[in-house]
Amino acid sequence: PLAFAQIKVGMVTDAGTIDDKSFNQGTWEGIQKAGKDLGVKTKYLKPTGTTEADYVKEISNLNDAGFKFIVTPGFKFETAIFAAQDKYSDAKFVLIDGSPNNGAFDSTRQEKVGPNTVSIFFAEHESGFLAGVAAALQIKTGDFGFIGGMEIPPVQKFNWGFQQGVAYANKNLGTKITIKDENVIYQGTFSDVAAGQQLAAQMFDKGVKVIFCAAGGVGVGAINEAKARAAKGVWIVGVDVDQYSQGEYAAKKSIILTSAMKRIDVAAYDMIKAEKAGKFPGGQTLTFNAKNDGVGIPAVDPNLSADTAKKT
């Protein structure tokens, strides 16, 4: 392990802020918990842009400042870590939701999880499934929708899992929920808040009762639209973290029905803990799933009845 008297854990954020109620925040919360529990020093840097060069620059800045255990959240860091793991071979890297590669999509493509890197993925379909079952049980009849960000595997897995969960509830638990093709939309970005609000408005206007958003900032727009219509009984299923507080529109009232969570915080924390114990799984690709508490729905979901909570 890195000499732990001096271990310093650094994080580079993606385009979002550290309190984005999503990937950056989840990662940082895990790192901060490690700071508290394990006595490691922590720091994050926000790049000025979103190119590989911008990311590598901040990785370099962390490394130069002695922050040699570096955690990066999201697939956008894949090429930066591919370069950095060789360049800074005495540092350790944790890439969440991605695997290091050179960014090529032809015969020149190279992929490598270096001996000083761990690549972490999540079984999104499992938490999507649980959220689908819970939402169907709670609402019982009507139309559901899905808004995704970019059409990439983690987002697709959330969508497919959610649809499977709803189908399971329809078949086995007496619910009658439909998800029409026209109400399954990938917006194409994770940042267009206005587009998210517009898409949600269109779906709600068509009578959709619940929208599952796996779309970062686009989902923030959908949440805002649902808040404006809270009196009409519309809901959002949150993603990545428990988004209940983000959906609050009045004291103790939220339009977040449940959330399909990826315990990004647990992943970051577990890797730092492994490093401290001299068991950093360098060179490996790990999957966090329902079995190892890596995904799931919140333990406390105020908008789900006791009966729904029991069945899920």
Task: Name each model feature, range by range.
Residues 5-312:
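A residue-level marker of the well-folded mature domains of exported/periplasmic proteins
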